[in-house]
Amino acid sequence: MHPQQLVVSWFSLVLLASPIVAMWELEKNVYVVELDWYPDAPGETVVLTCDTPEEDGITWTSDQSSEVLGSGKTLTIQVKEFGDAGQYTCHKGGEALSRSLLLLHKKEDGIWSTDILKDQKEPKAKSFLKCEAKDYSGHFTCWWLTAISTDLKFSVKSSRGSSDPRGVTCGAALLSAEKVSLEHREYNKYTVECQEGSACPAAEESLLIEVVVEAVHKLKYENYTSSFFIRDIIKPDPPKNLQLRPLKNSRQVEVSWEYPDTWSTPHSYFSLTFCVQVQGKNKREKKLFMDQTSAKVTCHKDANVRVQARDRYYSSFWSEWASVSCS
């Protein structure tokens, strides 16, 4: 056999004899075991090591079992289901030396589980995370829904491209007081605020921002990802300071408004376009679209005039409506 062929054969043998363990560290002493989830799946062989210089007299227990699981500095276990996950502790002489928490990440038919968060199905299927920005400053808010209310933990990471993984900072996920009804069921809403450190509002974006939400429910781990440009998640705040001014010898009134305080400046560069509509009790008038901050409308008694805004040069989301009463 040619020497080069011998080296290749030996290398292949080493690969076959050294299976890759699908386990990684989520945080200190917390590990995620990735499992193919199907009937009679073999599971994953996991080796735990006691974090101690001691060598003798070490025993292992689990919070899932009252029995001693093994002895020695390492413990080898076969992880097949949630009953094999949980906290493993090594002891000596009645004293706990170190602990390791095992979480499971399920994969069924090649697809990672998405049991913890609710699919909001907008703007497309598998929309678990939604993000919005009020302007081009690099600050944005993301949120997600879940029916679960206990034993739940989230962490959020974000970056713009792989070259600067620390370029976007996200705070802690917060449970909103707002409940969201979807498909005849109520869901808890969690939000997180993020800020790009070196954002340049006027610059053309070339690298996507990526947001990753890691979710842990009891012993189940899942992660969810959303990628976007800031320009694609822009939703301005509603116009402010709506006012009506009667016009002499006319049934019409002039409605005026101002740019929202949160919108990027200068407004000559970051311009908005507006939609104006008169809304009565049983009827909505035709919408008027314009770039200026005033319009003439016929204002009926018991009706409202409402105005919304969006980016003039890029098709952002429309803002929520701001309204003023005609009466």
Swiss-Prot record:
Q: Where is the signal peptide?
A: 1-22
Which keywords label this protein?
Cytokine, Disulfide bond, Glycoprotein, Immunoglobulin domain, Secreted, Signal
What CDD domains does UniProt report for this protein, alphabetically?
FN3
The cross-references to InterPro entries, in alphabetical order and at most eight, read: FN3_dom (IPR003961), FN3_sf (IPR036116), Hematopoietin_rcpt_L_F3_CS (IPR003530), Ig-like_dom (IPR007110), Ig-like_dom_sf (IPR036179), Ig-like_fold (IPR013783), Ig_sub2 (IPR003598), IL-12 (IPR050676)
Task: Return the SUPFAM superfamilies for the record.
Answer: Fibronectin type III, Immunoglobulin
In the record, biological process GO terms are:
interleukin-12-mediated signaling pathway; natural killer cell activation; positive regulation of activated T cell proliferation; positive regulation of type II interferon production; T-helper cell differentiation; type II interferon production
The residues that the database entry marks as glycosylated are 223
Q: Note the SMART domains from the entry.
A: IGc2
Compartment(s) of residence: Secreted
Q: Quick check: keyword Lyase in the entry? A: no
**Entry's Gene Ontology cellular component terms:** extracellular space; interleukin-12 complex; membrane
Superkingdom, natural source: Eukaryota
Which Pfam family, any one of them, does this sequence belong to?
IL12p40_C
Name the family.
Belongs to the IL-12B family.
Q: What does this protein do?
A: Cytokine that can act as a growth factor for activated T and NK cells, enhance the lytic activity of NK/lymphokine-activated killer cells, and stimulate the production of IFN-gamma by resting PBMC. Associates with IL23A to form the IL-23 interleukin, a heterodimeric cytokine which functions in innate and adaptive immunity. IL-23 may constitute with IL-17 an acute response to infection in peripheral tissues. IL-23 binds to a heterodimeric receptor complex composed of IL12RB1 and IL23R, activates the Jak-Stat signaling cascade, stimulates memory rather than naive T-cells and promotes production of pro-inflammatory cytokines. IL-23 induces autoimmune inflammation and thus may be responsible for autoimmune inflammatory diseases and may be important for tumorigenesis.
Which PANTHER family does the entry link to? Answer: INTERLEUKIN-12 SUBUNIT BETA, INTERLEUKIN-12 SUBUNIT BETA-RELATED
What protein does this entry describe?
A: Interleukin-12 subunit beta
Q: Which organism is it from?
A: Bos taurus
| Gene expressing this chain | IL12B
